[in-house]
């Protein structure tokens, strides 16, 4: 009899654990975030004006347009926000592994990425441009001029794909940060850098020896940024879209970008 009781208790315990695990796995990301009271956001803080570091109140602080959007999302959810910084090519991987709840880091919702992640409505649209040395603008007038030349891009970015598609005869060098790519250009290691337009403008304004080329880089669509989250995050996605719609209607996203851009220039002169 005791043996049977032990077996029944054992089965009951296994059933309870299985049921608990099933309930946990079936929870939407929104419920998981609200349960823990914190929204963990993956980003790469080297992409001004969307996310970058500056000194505030004596502390190294992550700021930028994406940061403000993430804060607005956390406010809507009624939770705290925690920013987890990493290299850009690890941002989406952290969402996929569950280490981060969302990723907002100038991420384009490509068809390939949409197979693995849920994405919010787009919150910012831009275009991709090519930065060269100012005294070389006359040398590089079309994509063919970069044949057998080196062009730098940020590893894992949509610009990496655009560069490879448009500059197929060039040597595309993938680097961890946009700043590294700019340094390679200034030192003569590469002849061009492919960047998102707002990012390129920031670097050109800070470096009088650089310029945005007139060369047009073709893409299937405009480079549009969205918030990434785990597949099946329907409830969270609805909340994020609500925040994005409100911010866009109020013109706040454009203000975030403008203010962050001004701050990035100010920070670079310190």
Task: Give the location of each predicted region.
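Extended ligand-binding regions for polar small-molecule ligands
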Residues: 24, 67-76, 155-157, 224-263
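Extracytoplasmic small-molecule ligand-binding "clamshell" domains
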Residues: 28-106
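Short helix-initiation/N-cap motifs at beta->coil->alpha
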Residues: 65, 83-93, 138, 173-183, ...
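Acidic, polar ligand-binding/catalytic clefts
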Residues: 71, 80-143
């Amino acid at each position: 009899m005791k043996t049977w009781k032990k077996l029944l208790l054992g089965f009951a315990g296994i059933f309870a654990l299985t049921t608990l695990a099933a309930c946990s796995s079936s929870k939407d990301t929104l419920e998981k975030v609200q349960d823990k009271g914190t929204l963990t956001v993956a980003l790469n803080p080297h992409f001004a004006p969307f996310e970058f570091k500056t000194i505030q109140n004596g502390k190294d602080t992550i700021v930028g347009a994406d940061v403000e959007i993430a804060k607005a999302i956390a406010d809507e959810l009624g939770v705290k926000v925690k920013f987890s910084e990493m290299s850009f090519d690890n941002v989406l991987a952290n969402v996929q592994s569950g280490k981060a709840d969302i990723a907002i880091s100038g991420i384009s919702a490509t068809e390939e990425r949409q197979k693995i992640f849920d994405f919010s409505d787009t919150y910012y649209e831009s275009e991709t441009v090519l930065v060269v040395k100012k005294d070389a603008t006359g040398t590089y007038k079309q994509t063919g001029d970069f044949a057998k030349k080196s062009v730098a891009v940020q590893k894992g970015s949509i610009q990496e794909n655009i560069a490879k598609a448009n500059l197929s005869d060039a040597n595309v060098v993938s680097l961890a940060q946009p700043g590294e790519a700019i340094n390679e250009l200034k030192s003569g290691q590469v002849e061009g850098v492919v960047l998102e337009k707002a990012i390129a403008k920031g670097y050109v304004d800070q470096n009088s020896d650089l310029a945005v080329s007139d060369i047009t880089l073709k893409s299937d669509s405009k480079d549009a940024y969205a918030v990434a989250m785990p597949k099946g995050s329907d409830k969270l996605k609805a909340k994020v879209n609500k925040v994005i719609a409100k911010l866009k209607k109020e013109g706040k996203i454009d203000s975030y970008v403008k203010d962050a851009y001004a701050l990035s220039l100010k920070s670079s002169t310190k």
